[in-house]
Regions:
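Conserved nucleotide-binding/hydrolysis micro-motifs of P-loop NTPases
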Residues: 146
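Conserved alpha-helical substructure of the radical SAM core
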Residues: 1-138, 149-153, 158, 162
């Protein structure tokens, strides 16, 4: 397995929007495999369960059947989306189907790349291998501190920082 650290934004291969609008296919599509999260970060609305209930946002993971329907619908675009981002406000690794979602999107050719952002608390070597084998192109790790104390203060999670 070969991995590299790279900037999150690729300034060299960006599409100048003024050359492609109006778009017939989205460049980037965000799908949230999980509306739930195992952290309670101060900056994130997902940590406020009362607010999430008030706005009608469920606290659950996306069912594979729904993801399969979305992928089937994506085939109606004129071309593949550039990036399918499998994250938004929840922790994507809470979804047990995450590797299968990555694999399906790649196999069906509905996107050029699949990426995700995770707090990495659920990322084990075994899970990492499954996700890589499924075809994930990029994983961003959201680091909420540089010590156990900072993590606890910021995300309300007791965590051994060295485990991330």
């Amino acid at each position: 397995m070969k991995a590299e650290f790279a900037p999150r934004i690729d300034l060299h291969n960006r599409t100048a929007l003024e050359t492609v609008i109006p778009l017939d296919t989205p460049l980037v599509l965000f799908l949230d495999p999980s509306d739930a999260c195992n952290f309670k970060c101060k900056f994130c609305p997902t940590s406020d369960r009362k607010l999430m209930k008030e706005v009608g946002r469920p606290w659950r993971t996306m069912k594979m059947e729904l993801f399969e329907k979305i992928v089937a619908d994506m085939k109606n675009f004129n071309r593949p989306v550039e990036v399918l981002r499998l994250y938004k406000d929840g922790e994507p690794l809470l979804n047990k189907n995450f590797p299968a979602m990555v694999r399906l999107a790649k196999q069906e050719g509905v996107c050029n790349r699949v990426d995700t952002t995770t707090n990495a608390s659920l990322l084990t070597p075994e899970r990492g291998e499954k996700i890589i084998e499924a075809g994930l192109d990029r994983i961003n790790i959201s680091i909420e501190g540089i010590s156990n104390e900072q993590y606890k203060n910021f995300s309300d999670v007791k965590l051994e920082f060295s485990s991330i």
